[in-house]
């Protein structure tokens, strides 16, 4: 039987700091090997003199955390390498995006997210049931 890995990540904290709240789902059919893509990505980083560090957009854009001391050019090159890797990898993704100012409360936002996530899962039900 095939196996599907689903990775879920969110971006945009609660409260007033971020304008948007994003919920991303990355789906990877484990029968589709990504090892060569990872090796190629790591080689590309090494050739360009870039560190192989986890990609986190907010710190990358602001030169915080693991990106401190990196120039804007280095951070742009890192993002370009990762983008190329992501485009070539055999996985798919879905992103739910919400403008936080459109909701009266965090509870309203979460209710909308829950409904949207249920609809998304039902839209993908046939595909998901194949695993």
What residues fall within each predicted segment?
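Phosphate-ester processing/binding pockets and catalytic centers
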Residues: 1-131
């Amino acid at each position: 039987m095939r196996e599907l890995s689903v990775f879920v990540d969110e971006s945009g904290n609660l409260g007033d700091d971020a304008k948007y709240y994003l919920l991303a789902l990355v789906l990877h059919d484990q029968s589709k090997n990504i090892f060569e893509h990872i090796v190629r990505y790591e080689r590309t980083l090494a050739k360009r003199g870039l560190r192989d560090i986890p990609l986190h957009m907010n710190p990358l854009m602001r030169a915080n955390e693991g990106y401190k001391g990196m120039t804007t050019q280095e951070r742009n090159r890192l993002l370009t390498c990762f983008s190329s890797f992501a485009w070539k990898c055999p996985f798919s993704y879905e992103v739910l995006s919400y403008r936080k100012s459109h909701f009266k409360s965090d509870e309203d936002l979460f209710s909308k997210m829950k409904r949207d996530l249920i609809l998304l899962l039902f839209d993908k039900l046939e595909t998901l049931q194949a695993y």
